[in-house]
A protein has these predicted regions:
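Short, Lys/Arg- and Gly-enriched loop/turn segments at beta-strand edges
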Residues: 67-75
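Short, conserved beta-turn/loop elements at beta-strand boundaries and strand-helix junctions
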Residues: 27, 42, 83-88
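C-terminal output/interaction extensions
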Residues: 87-128
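Conserved hydrophobic positions within beta-strands
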Residues: 37, 78-80
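N-terminal helix initiation/capping motif
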Residues: 1-40, 48, 112-128
Length: 128
């Protein structure tokens, strides 16, 4: 992260608030869990979950979003690089910084289009 002349941090890859559901699976576990993607960039995600996930854990994640009348997703393989306790009204859990380690090119294109889109995620259209 760089510091601008005005003293504000500038990221190489800007983050976009998303508020989208995701499913994740710890690489060594047979079951899936859920959470919310708070924001994203081309290199990482800020995710929210009620589960306590250790730093360094590798996750397979599918971020879900509507496309017309269907639900679609893009998938990433990532690593938890930081975590914080997080509280909201009637909710307690964790925020995690997830570094994207691997993503298929088609999924990367979907993520980039979602991030660069000026419309709401529910209006995002995936190329056929």
């Amino acid at each position: 992260m760089k510091i601008s002349p005005m003293g504000k941090a500038r990221r190489r890859f800007p983050r976009l608030p998303l508020d989208l559901p995701f499913e994740y699976r710890v690489v060594s576990a047979p079951y899936s869990r859920g959470g919310i993607v708070v924001n994203a960039s081309e290199v990482g995600l800020l995710i929210q979950s009620i589960k306590n996930i250790p730093i360094g854990t590798k996750l397979m994640i599918a971020v879900l979003f509507p496309r017309g009348f269907e639900l679609t997703s893009f998938k990433v393989f990532g690593e938890v690089i930081w975590k914080d306790l997080h509280w909201e009204e009637n909710w307690e859990g964790f925020h995690y910084g997830l570094k994207i380690i691997q993503i298929l090119e088609e999924d990367r294109r979907m993520l980039r289009r979602l991030l660069s889109s000026r419309v709401h995620p529910e209006e995002f259209s995936h190329p056929s």
